Regions:
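C-terminal cap of metal-dependent C-N hydrolases
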Residues: 9, 344-346, 350, 363-407
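Histidine/acidic residue-rich metal-binding segments in metalloenzymes
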Residues: 119, 160-240, 244-266, 283-306, ...
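N-terminal metal-binding scaffold of metallo-dependent hydrolase/deaminase domains
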Residues: 1-44, 55-57, 374-379, 394
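Divalent metal-coordination and catalytic microenvironments
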Residues: 9, 26, 31, 54, ...
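Active-site gating loops and adjacent loop-to-helix segments of metal-dependent hydrolytic enzymes
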Residues: 67-88, 97-100, 130, 138, ...
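Histidine/acidic-residue-rich catalytic or RNA/ligand-binding cores of hydrolases
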Residues: 72-75, 117, 186-189, 225-233, ...
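His/Asp/Glu-enriched, well-ordered alpha-helical/loop segment
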Residues: 210, 289-372
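Metal-associated gating/positioning segment near the N- to mid-region
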Residues: 55-126, 199
Length: 408
């Protein structure tokens, strides 16, 4: 379908504080939004119309942090690395399809080991594979033996940094990823430890900027968060304020205020796994929930700008399950549905540098939107099963999504 009109849906454009009170029309032509409202009704020159009375139309969702190369059913790097390249590519195609069918129309892949996500991006763009708009970080820069070193991004000297940056740019990575601290997934790595001195992080950011790329910094420990901010990264991933006693135990409120005053965004990777940790076995609020809700709510109070992200692919976090992550995010950070939805649409688009293409329902942008049976600004549960997903103008209703096979 290259030219059609969606009529009688209530619209949330990705910016407003509430759902549109009146129904409206959206004209889609050649994969883009041609016009809205009265202009769409007056100027539409096609014949195909969809009467969406009772439906709620919102922008397609954005997950700002996933790992398509990872299988969430596997628990260790050794298990991940034991898979064959063909197995990995086949699973990546399935995950991409499942993400789009769940309403995720844009995502940023925050790291893998062989630039397979770049090939997947090309196949999606050529419409050979069903999947969302894909932004790729490539191999994360990490210290020798550091977090995710098995993906081949180990660097120490300035020359090694320059060579690794060049490798990512030559692969046509959209972003550069750096592991500013240790992580949880890598044996022998401690999440609170810094992996690079501030000067080295500065050189990574400067090198990326010369190539026209922003930097995403994996940061759990508080010192690593501070160093990444001062080095000038665009997004801080996780921002967990990990201390000796665990996540959310080394909070620095002055640093939070500094982040809030900056141009940096925080991508907190709250996901379905976090949702399963809200209560302990006795049904009381868990220690993890109390610590991380306090951490995120202090960040919010400090003026920090959040973007929705899940770290999908890590153990137990399915790539398509952004809706569950958004529900958990609302609880941990004490956000209203509209605040959560902005973080997963217009705000995420700005942070990722694609606001001229997507993130809002607006004339001139890509036709990326969802039609929902109920109002997501009243309850985020509305996101669990979109009636229709539209990506680059392609109409994917429930029946189409349920019978569509993954393209080989």
């Amino acid at each position: 379908m290259n030219n059609y009109l969606v009529k009688n849906a209530r619209l949330w454009n990705g910016l407003d504080g509430k759902m549109g009170a009146l129904t409206t029309s959206v004209w889609v032509r050649e994969g883009r939004i041609e016009a809205l409202g009265q202009a769409a009704d007056a100027d539409f020159d096609g014949t195909q119309c969809f009467d969406e009375t009772g439906q709620f139309l919102i922008p397609g969702l954005i997950d700002a942090h996933v790992h398509l190369e990872l299988d969430p059913s596997l628990r260790s790097p050794a298990q991940q690395l034991a898979r064959t390249p063909d197995e990995i590519v086949a699973s990546m195609k399935r995950y991409a399809r499942d993400m789009l069918f769940a309403g995720i129309t844009t995502t940023r892949d925050c790291g893998g080991g062989a630039h397979r996500e770049h090939g997947l991006r090309a196949e999606i763009d050529r419409r050979r594979v069903v999947g969302p708009r894909l932004l790729c970080c490539g191999q994360p820069l990490t210290s020798p033996g550091g977090h995710c070193h098995f993906w081949g991004g180990e660097v120490s000297s300035r020359l090694e940094v320059e060579a690794m940056l060049s490798r990512q740019i030559e692969a046509d990575s959209d972003w550069i990823k750096v592991m500013a601290t240790g992580g949880v997934f890598t044996p022998g790595s401690r999440a609170r430890d810094t992996q690079f001195e501030l000067g080295r992080l500065v050189s990574i950011v400067e090198g990326a900027e010369k190539a026209g790329r922003h930097v995403a910094a994996h940061c759990h420990g508080t010192q690593g968060i501070a160093d990444a901010l001062r080095a000038g990264v665009r997004t801080i991933e996780h921002a967990s304020f990990v201390g000796e006693k665990g996540f959310g135990t080394d909070i620095d409120e002055s640093l939070m205020l500094e982040i809030g005053r900056s141009t940096c965004w925080v991508s907190p990777t709250v996901n379905a796994g976090w949702g399963r940790r809200i209560k302990d076995k006795e049904g009381a609020p868990s220690v993890f929930f109390e610590r991380m809700s306090n951490c995120l709510q202090k960040q919010r109070a400090s003026g920090i700008r959040f973007i929705a992200s899940t770290d999908a692919g890590i153990p137990g976090v399915a790539h398509h399950d952004l809706a569950a992550g958004l529900a958990a995010f609302s609880k941990y950070a004490d956000l209203t549905p509209v605040e959560v939805l902005r973080s997963a649409t217009s705000e995420a688009a700005i942070a990722l540098g694609v606001e001229a293409e997507t993130g809002r329902v607006e004339a001139g942008l890509s036709a990326d939107f969802l039609l929902l049976d109920s109002d997501p600004l009243e309850s985020l549960d509305a996101l669990n099963d979109p009636r229709v997903v539209v990506f680059r103008g392609e109409w994917l209703d429930r029946e189409t999504r349920r019978v569509a096979p993954a393209k080989a």
